[in-house]
Curated annotation (Swiss-Prot):
Function, as annotated: Part of the ABC transporter complex PotABCD involved in spermidine/putrescine import. Responsible for energy coupling to the transport system.
An example Gene Ontology molecular-function term: ABC-type putrescine transporter activity
GO cellular-component term (any): ATP-binding cassette (ABC) transporter complex
Protein species of origin: Clostridioides difficile (strain 630) (Peptoclostridium difficile)
SMART domains, A to Z: AAA
SUPFAM superfamilies in UniProt: MOP-like, P-loop containing nucleoside triphosphate hydrolases
Gene that encodes the chain: potA
UniProt-annotated binding residues for ATP: G38, P39, S40, G41, C42, G43, K44, T45
Protein name (database record): Spermidine/putrescine import ATP-binding protein PotA
Gene3D superfamilies linked: 2.40.50.100, P-loop containing nucleotide triphosphate hydrolases
Assembly and binders: The complex is composed of two ATP-binding proteins (PotA), two transmembrane proteins (PotB and PotC) and a solute-binding protein (PotD).
């Protein structure tokens, strides 16, 4: 059985009248890359700060390897944090920045030298010891910040939107680099972001948050392919969402016709919501489609065209490598495995 390294139990946090975390529970496993994903104000950074000890919960318990650490100050917790603002010391070179925490602990110089060299090699900056941090690129500075956190050998590394200030290409490179570092070290990473691509690319587990609550927790594949509610479906990628009725196991009705699906376990004639991803819709001739509609707009997105279709007053979004002409009629085919059923939310 996989052991949890961090457990949050019934955590609540309020700022005056605002509830940031509401009876929040989360288990974080040893050696996993877990991402807290959600829009601004959902509580993800507050969760990270409570784990780090920079904020204290109003109610609930924080457990580290089974022991409560609610009142433990940050410097006594076996975690280190990397922020979007790297907070490097501009008057120090790379070596001095990375070694800073070890010097505070009065670590012997030969041990510091060995650890700094080892961690700079890990972040692919071997030989940069005497470079001034101001001479480094944004990506290199981010690696130094990560090296400074890792040199203390924490059991958990907390990362609060650390790639937000980087340009797209560098951000994508750092996503791969962070995952490589985490796998090599085998320690727990807890990563905070509002960027869905970052979460899907790097994570073993994604925790989707909204208004201080967990909406869904699972693998990237589970979160993307089987969203539990309309918030998750809309937040993770683009989605076509329609009201429907679950006629029986493996059969659903939406858009005024019956479809085969792969879902079961619903009540007969239960009101549900249907999610279909734009890339899962097959474009066919109008007479060959399960549904058909008129093209209202197309946009070139680089790797595909985004096509908007009006089907009996309902807006559909399709992604296809082939374009379609505005005003023409298209058919749509949808395979059973591409129809995802969600229970209707109680509003």
């Amino acid at each position: 059985m996989v052991e949890n390294i961090i457990e949050l139990r019934d955590i609540s946090k309020h700022y005056e009248e605002l509830t940031v975390l509401d009876n929040f529970n989360l288990d974080i496993k040893k050696n996993e890359f877990l991402t807290l994903l959600g829009p601004s104000g959902c509580g993800k950074t507050t969760t990270l700060k409570i784990i780090a000890g920079f904020e204290y919960a109003d109610d609930g318990k924080v457990l580290f390897e089974g022991k409560e650490i609610n009142n433990l100050p940050p410097y006594e917790r076996q975690v280190n944090t990397v922020f979007q603002k790297y907070a490097l010391f501009p008057h120090m070179d790379v070596y001095e920045n990375v070694a800073f925490g070890l010097k505070i602990k009065k670590t012997p110089k030969d041990v510091i030298d060995a650890k700094v060299k080892e961690v700079l090699k890990l972040v692919a900056l071997e030989g940069f010891e005497r470079r001034q941090v101001e001479s480094l690129s944004g990506g290199q500075q981010q690696r130094i910040a990560i090296a400074r956190a890792l040199v203390n050998e924490p059991k958990v590394l907390l990362l609060d939107e650390p790639l937000g200030a980087l340009d797209l290409k560098l951000r994508q490179e750092m996503q791969i680099e962070l995952k490589r570092i985490q796998k090599k070290l085998g320690i727990t990473f807890v990563f905070v972001t509002h960027d869905q691509e970052e979460a899907l690319t790097m994570s073993d587990t994604i925790v989707v948050m909204y208004k201080g609550k967990i909406q869904q927790m699972g693998t990237p594949q589970d979160i993307y392919n089987e969203p539990k509610n309309s918030f998750v479906a809309k937040f993770i990628g683009e989605s076509n969402i329609f009201d429907g009725i679950m006629i029986e196991d493996y059969k659903v009705n939406f858009c005024n016709r019956d479809f085969e699906c792969v879902d079961k376990g619903f009540e007969k004639n239960e009101n549900i919501e249907v999610v279909i991803r734009p890339e899962d819709i097959k474009m066919v001739k109008p007479e060959e489609g399960m549904l058909k509609g008129k093209v209202t707009s197309t946009v070139f997105k680089g790797v595909h065209y985004e096509i908007e279709l009006n089907e009996n007053g309902r807006l559909w979004i399709l992604h296809n490598t082939k374009n379609a002409e505005v005003g023409t009629e298209l058919g749509m085919d949808i395979y059973p495995e591409d129809i995802h059923i969600m229970r209707k939310e109680n509003n």
